[in-house]
């Protein structure tokens, strides 16, 4: 029997393993910025006290790189506006090319961190 993907299908993102990855990405974000009470969007650098309006984004896409799905360093924090903007601008190209995230974030210390991860991961 085949099952159809319904509107509640999450492609594994509802799993405890994914939620743990997401939590750890947020913790890493705080550490990168030397903060204890705030989270920071890596694009716009706005500080947030909660993760409610923040997303954990995969540098190497969830779809194309299943072996990197739960690697904590493969995650960055973007506010929902910057995250939506990234996917609107690059659409499916972003699935294949992690360097587009560096281009999108621009030249700041955050893009340097991502560039180093991509370079060291090859």
What residue spans do the PLM features occupy?
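Histidine-centered catalytic micro-motifs
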Residues: 54-62, 82-86
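Short cysteine/histidine-rich metal-coordination sites, predominantly Zn2+-binding motifs
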Residues: 58-64, 94-103
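Short linker/helix segments within small regulatory modules
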Residues: 60-74
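Residues immediately within or flanking Cys/His clusters that coordinate Zn2+
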Residues: 38-41, 53, 76
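Short Cys/His-centered divalent metal-binding micro-motifs
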Residues: 49, 75-97
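Short, charged surface segments at domain edges that flank catalytic/cofactor-binding sites
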Residues: 2-45, 67-69
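Short Fe-S-cluster ligation motifs
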Residues: 72-81, 108-122
């Amino acid at each position: 029997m085949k099952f159809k993907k319904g509107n509640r299908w999450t492609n594994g993102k509802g799993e405890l393993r994914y939620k743990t990855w997401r939590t750890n990405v947020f913790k890493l974000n705080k550490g990168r910025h030397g903060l204890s009470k705030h989270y920071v969007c890596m694009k716009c650098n706005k500080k947030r006290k909660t993760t409610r309006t923040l997303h954990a984004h995969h540098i190497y896409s969830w779809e194309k790189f299943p072996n990197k799905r739960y690697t904590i360093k493969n995650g960055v924090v973007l506010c929902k506006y910057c995250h939506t903007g990234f996917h609107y601008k690059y659409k499916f190209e972003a699935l294949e090319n992690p360097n587009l995230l560096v281009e999108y974030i621009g030249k700041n210390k955050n893009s340097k961190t991502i560039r180093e991860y991509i370079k060291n991961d090859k």
